[in-house]
Amino acid sequence: MGTPELKIILEFSAGAELLFGNIKRRELNLDGKQKWTIANLLKWMHANILTERPELFLQGDTVRPGILVLINDTDWELLGELDYELQPNDNVLFISTLHGG
């Protein structure tokens, strides 16, 4: 029997995808033996898929102001933000509200 996996979908919109190799959607198979919170996911994203200007996406251990995070179409602030524990087939959407003028 194989290692358990946690399958989730990451989506990036409104310019956030530019920081992640211009890829708008990624299906991930994370190690299912560990507990995955949004905090852990952000660290994984920084180490593995954040390709451009991390200061535009992260501020300390969280997303910077101006990045909206929706989990299954619900504002992450209603779900515990960094402490939210990811569930199988969760859809995590990052939307940038930071636009140049």
Curated annotation (Swiss-Prot):
GO terms for molecular function: protein tag activity. Signal peptide: none annotated. C-terminal thiocarboxylation occurs in 2 steps, it is first acyl-adenylated (-COAMP) via the hesA/moeB/thiF part of the MOCS3 homolog, then thiocarboxylated (-COSH) via the rhodanese domain of the MOCS3 homolog. The gene is Urm1. The modification 1-thioglycine is found at G101. GO terms for biological process: negative regulation of JNK cascade; protein urmylation; tRNA thio-modification; tRNA wobble uridine modification. Belongs to the URM1 family. One of its GO terms (cellular component) is cytosol. Acts as a sulfur carrier required for 2-thiolation of mcm(5)S(2)U at tRNA wobble positions of cytosolic tRNA(Lys), tRNA(Glu) and tRNA(Gln). Serves as sulfur donor in tRNA 2-thiolation reaction by being thiocarboxylated (-COSH) at its C-terminus by MOCS3. The sulfur is then transferred to tRNA to form 2-thiolation of mcm(5)S(2)U. Also acts as a ubiquitin-like protein (UBL) that is covalently conjugated via an isopeptide bond to lysine residues of target proteins such as Prx2/Jafrac1, Ciao1, Eip71CD and GILT1. It is found in: Cytoplasm. Interacts with cer. This is Ubiquitin-related modifier 1 homolog. Keywords: Cytoplasm, Isopeptide bond, tRNA processing, Ubl conjugation pathway. Pathway: tRNA modification; 5-methoxycarbonylmethyl-2-thiouridine-tRNA biosynthesis. It comes from Drosophila melanogaster (Fruit fly). InterPro entries: Beta-grasp_dom_sf, Mopterin_synth/thiamin_S_b, Urm1.
